[in-house]
Amino acid sequence: MVINMKGDFINYCGLLGIVAFLSYTAAVVFSPLAYPGYNWMAQAVSDLSAANAPSLRLWNQLSCLYNVSTLVCAMMVCAGIQGKGSRILRLGIYLFTAMEWVSAVGFSMFPLSDSGYAGTFQDQMHIFSTIIVVLLSIISLVLIIIAGIKDKEYRLYGAFAGIALGMM
């Protein structure tokens, strides 16, 4: 029996997407407990990780695996899709990975300075990062949906991309 180490490694690293999901979900669910008066219907999730948020420490602890796991997972998907799939599918995946990098770097470098929007340069860069992340998310997911519509081999990718886009 021969084990494909490269393929197995890529597949196992792909499972870090689940770790990222659980880490981010824990941060979103439990960080409000450390933020008196936080209203999830009226406030952005970014308020939980603002530079002066009372929940910042808990947010950082719970989300510590999110960025690294997301980036490794996305990069492994890029490595695994090379030379495979349609051009539209690959472009969608590459743009989604670019979005993950912009998210990881942009939001780490420029957390909100204060809950809400204080209008500082840091806040402006946070908003700019958000705009880029949202645009890349929409474009990449639409491309993956199109790939799923055009080729039934990628229909499941398209369906999950549609669900993700709908949840946005």
Where do the protein language model's features map onto the residues?
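Short, Lys/Arg-rich, polar N-terminal cytosolic tail immediately upstream
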Residues: 1-12
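Interfacial segments of alpha-helical transmembrane regions
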Residues: 10-17, 85-98, 154-163
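Alpha-helical transmembrane segments of multi-pass membrane proteins
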Residues: 21-39
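Membrane-interface interhelical loops and short amphipathic "cap" helices
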Residues: 39-54, 114-123
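Interfacial helix-start motif at the membrane-water boundary
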Residues: 48-68
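Internal transmembrane alpha-helix with an interfacial aromatic "cap," most often the third helix
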Residues: 65-92, 139-149
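Aromatic-anchored segments of alpha-helical transmembrane domains
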Residues: 99-106, 164-168
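Membrane-proximal helix-loop-helix units in multi-pass membrane proteins
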Residues: 103-146
